[in-house]
Amino acid sequence: KIGYGKLRFSLGKMKNQSIPKEIKALLDTISWTEGTISREANGYDILVGYTSNNSRKIESWNENYPKGHQDHNWYYPRADSTAAGRYQFLGNTWKEVSQTYLNESNANFNKENQDYLAYKRLKWRLSNKGISEQYILDTLSDKEKFVKVSNALAPEWASFPFIDNNGMQRSYYGGQNARDFEDVY
């Protein structure tokens, strides 16, 4: 089991903000659920549908990548998607968070911006459900609390499990595959 409390903390400096280690671990967990964490470049250069048998990567990507999100609709067996990067940002989402938090319409798709904007998006998703950052810090040892966190993040990251009122888990978006909650927690 991977569990968000067990992951290595691979995030670097984020826009001069101090990110609690539990939040860094949660961002690593998101990357793991999206299937990008163990890839070359730690997933920052991955396009939706990447496997070891194909080369769906952002051409010429590096940590200081000077271009924005490509916002190209890539064919993926289950659906077309614009998802890219470590956190599989959709093109429209990237532009929205770029404008909101960086005051740019399509910020550079580099490592620092991907980490920072994923952190901001995570906080936004959680706050919409009344979940504070402190609540996250308290969930490492409380599985029931983490269900609330998982359900809040599932609409943003389809690979995150959504647990319904009957305890059944699924992807928030019916046709996609979500990771098993026991593996995520």
Give residue ranges: language-model regions.
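Cell-wall polysaccharide-cleaving catalytic domain and substrate-binding groove, primarily
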Residues: 2-107, 116-185
